[in-house]
Amino acid sequence: MGKIILFEDVEFGGKKLELETSVSDLNVHGFNDIVSSIIVESGTWFVFDDEGFSGPSYKLTPGKYPNPGSWGGNDDELSSVKQQ
């Protein structure tokens, strides 16, 4: 089982959302299009710009991603996350 932590602001600031399962629509958690930094504690995750695991995606392995450029994405774009 993996774990990913999404943050509202760059450098791991603001509200955070900890997940251990895939989420097809981050709006359910109030986190649609607001993610600006990520910590992957374990597992491999794909983050997607659109709901339903669609649109541009980025593969993330354990580590810290302090801003969208660190995973190759854009600020405030993520809408779904999927654990591999």
Curated annotation (Swiss-Prot):
Pfam families: Crystall. SUPFAM superfamilies: gamma-Crystallin-like. Residues 64-84 are annotated as: Disordered. Residues 2-42, 43-84 form the Beta/gamma crystallin 'Greek key' domain. InterPro entries: Beta/Gamma-Crystallin, Beta/gamma_crystallin, G_crystallin-like. Keywords: Repeat. Transmembrane segments: none annotated. Palps of larvae and otolith of the light-sensing ocellus. Has a single-domain beta-structure, folded into two very similar Greek key motifs. Monomer. Structural component of the neuroectodermal visual system. Belongs to the beta/gamma-crystallin family. PANTHER family: BETA/GAMMA CRYSTALLIN, VOLTAGE-GATED HYDROGEN CHANNEL 1. This is Beta/gamma-crystallin.
